[in-house]
Amino acid sequence: PGNATRVLDAQGRTQPPGVRGELVGRSATMMPGSFRNEEADAAFYWRDADGVLFHRTGDIGMFDEDGFLVLLDRRKDLIISGGFNIYASDLEEKLLAHPDVADAAVIAIPSEKWGETPLGLVVPKPGRTLDAEELLSWVNAQLGRTQRISSIELRDELPRSNVGKVLKQELRKPYWEGHR
């Protein structure tokens, strides 16, 4: 009792099961906002039509048909290219399905035409040789036209945190210096 989770679209409308969106949550013990910081409140909180305060989690998810919450991605990893939302995790899943790929991350990089565009960063399996252009053709053949990866860079490894998460902010940084 007193707890709630919702999935919202970009306009703040609650989404039905099976539809992705930003996760917001509330509980009876949640603080009522930031102390004297309305700007922070605008970024981290959302109010429903009844004025009930919810915390923005920064996660993308959905409820499945059985009512279970499924976490899919982080909002900061969402790529908005030409007005289309592209989920990095969807593209990473496709890249990792290739038999010669050991690890993969997809990040947004600047694009003059689209605003942002997906870049695949791929680590080949030990002893395997990958051709970036061939892999790009292979993965894009499995994706919708608006989801396609612009290019692929091969790496020896991807930077990871102490708990094993790929440090996407570190990967994005050199591409965005001088932008935004």
Regions found by a protein language model. Give the residues of each.
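Conserved ATP/PPi-binding loop(s) of AMP-dependent carboxylate-activating enzymes
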Residues: P1-G2, R13-W46, I86
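AMP-binding/adenylate-forming catalytic core of the ANL superfamily
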Residues: T5, G25-S27, P32-G33, G51-L53, ...
